[in-house]
Amino acid sequence: MAIRIKLKPGRERSLERRHPWVFSNGIHNVNGGKPQAGDTVDVVAHDGRWLGRGAWSPESQIQVRIWTFDKEEAIDADFFARRIQRAQAGREDLIREQGLTGYRLIAAESDGLPGITIDRYADVLVCQLLNTGAEKWRDTLVEQLALQFPGCAIYERSDVDSRKKEGLAPVQGLLHGELPAMPIIIEENGIKIAVDVVKGHKTGFYLDQRDNRAIAARFVKGKSVLNCFCYTGTFGLYAAKAGAASIENVDVSALALQTARDNMAINGLDDSHVNYHEADVFKLLRQYRDEGKTFDVIVLDPPKFADNKSQLNGACRGYKDINMIAMQLLNPGGILLTFSCSGLMESDLFQKVVADAALDAKREVQFVERMHQASDHPISSAFPEGYYLKGLVARVW
């Protein structure tokens, strides 16, 4: 008999709406044994009704993450095979339409696999396993990926701090096959991009900004572009291909800026009008403001400012400050493309923060377009937390 996690009265409502998380403070008791980290458990309402089947995480505030809401569905190799097949099938049209050789294959909870992120870069699959359930099924997951994607190497980038909340150490290394020499070259929308899955951020690259890079390219022809927190320079790469008059790529990492140069070269683009600036963006923006320097288009794609609710107020102040300074650097009628990748920063709150920045900058701002993560990063209707990337196109007068 399966171990059963009984909820407190009234705590079943979120699971009835198919939200996949069970918090520790909602659990009444555990029956049928003592589950170990990653074990599969059944979750029942206080009145005994079966609700879902998930993975036990004893050290996390989220103590169960639901694998399935189907009582007849076992959690085994076939389960993972079905989830992977469904995820790939749901992305086939996008892959064909945009000519993708790099895309998100598995988007964790939004693809029914909590804590599991898998990105494909050409013939390399990069996995991030963030909780005890994912950890427990690592070998099975690798076996199923190898069966469905023969010829692909499988590499793990679970070198993230969030694993500490699960009592797990960071892990990085080859899981299957032979890793090719870095960088890997992927393509999107006819543009080639160099990706280092070993040393790069996250799993190697920010696939979620693909659609937004294309949006940015619509505004840059003949314009001066400041690309902040540029990483490997792909907003600048799209801008160069779209005919920007000048581009300044700014990042604190010399390695990232070298890859930005390489990206221009592998696309056969002249970068004589491109400046690569190794600097702290916050300090540089203030310096440029003091010098009276201006631009036609600015891209602000900063790192996450808030990891938990206690940091949200500080994050709002940070976003407001950096957007205010960016607005002060824009020529009248200029375009600001600004982003937040903090899941706690809801879309309406982010827009309010940017509107407040406009007031402080004493600039009139029109919101032209809202942006979000690319469609290979879907958002489950039952899991709004999956909507993490928010962006705004703002015209600044």
From Swiss-Prot:
Localization per record: Cytoplasm
Chief subcellular location: cytoplasm
EC code: 2.1.1.191
Signal peptide annotation: none
Official protein name in the record: Ribosomal RNA large subunit methyltransferase I
Alphabetized CDD domains for the sequence: AdoMet_MTases, PUA_RlmI, RlmI_M_like
UniProt function note: Specifically methylates the cytosine at position 1962 (m5C1962) of 23S rRNA.
